Structure formats: C-alpha cells, structure tokens
Amino acid sequence: IDDIVYRVTTEMGGIPAPLNYEGFPKSVCTSINDQVCHGIPSEDVILQDGDIINVDCSTILNGYFSDSSRMFMIGDVSPEKRKLVEVTKECVELGLKEIKPWSFMGDVGAVVCQHAAENGYTVVREIGGHGCGLEFHEEPWIGYHTKPGTEMLIVPGMTFTIEPMVNAGTERI
C-alpha cells in the first residue's frame, strides 16, 4: 500500500505528507483491526481475510496539504467489524451534514459522538479532526466530545478533516 501511495502521489505531482513528518518513515498511515490510527505500513504484515484497515492518505500539492482517511473491509469480515466500519462511515457523514457557515465545531462533534454511542461505540478523546491547508495539522482541532453551539465558529473558506476514531471499547487510545 505504501509503495502504491508513494508512486501514484508523486506521479501526480504531489508529495506524500507523512513521509519523514516528525520522523514518520512511510508515505501513508495504515491501521489494521484494533490499531486506532497512524499505523506504519510494513511488508511483513499481510492483510488477512476478515481484517479491517484504515488508510490515511495525506498529500502536499502546490504548497497545500490535504488529508483523507477511509476504512476498508478485507474479504469476509465478521458482523461486528462490518457494523463498526458502517457506523464509523455514518458518523463521518452525519458530521459532514452539520458543517455550514456560522455553525459550530461542537455541532459536528456532538452528532458524531451521539451516533457512535447510540450504536454501542465510543469515540477517542485524545485525537480528533484538524485543520489542514498551509500546514499538515493546524487549527481548528475538532473534538467529538462536545456540545452543540460550542467550540469554534465555522466560517466560509475553512478546511479541516472530520476523522472520528470510533472504538468498540473504551474512548481512550
């Protein structure tokens, strides 16, 4: 996966943002099964039927950073893993629907956390979404344990990620 991301990113004129960022050794983050985030891809780790994997791609293009994270199911996954992946996607979609000028980041976080909880899951507290643009990680920080009408005001032109880490267990890493 890392080789493909590096090759395609550079062929399209981009730079893989994670590569050498704070010592990170690869071009993409891959987190398998119960690993929360920022996993380091390895040729020694072979994906198995039933695994779930998060692929977190970030690119620098024309001086601007982008960041996108997606979950994938490998082969025949258990009903528990399938539900986790589906609810996580729903959390992202519900969060995105809350984004509009003059709303609040707390609106986004609250709906994400509520949907996860309604389905028996938690959302990690320590890591959240973030702004991206001229820097890899910039303001605002998007937490998911928030209340509607609180946190930063969303204004036109802001760019940020909605990347909730939804867990089947504790809200801690």
Over which residues does each language-model region extend?
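Active-site neighborhoods and metal-handling regions in enzymes and metal-associated proteins
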Residues: I1-I173
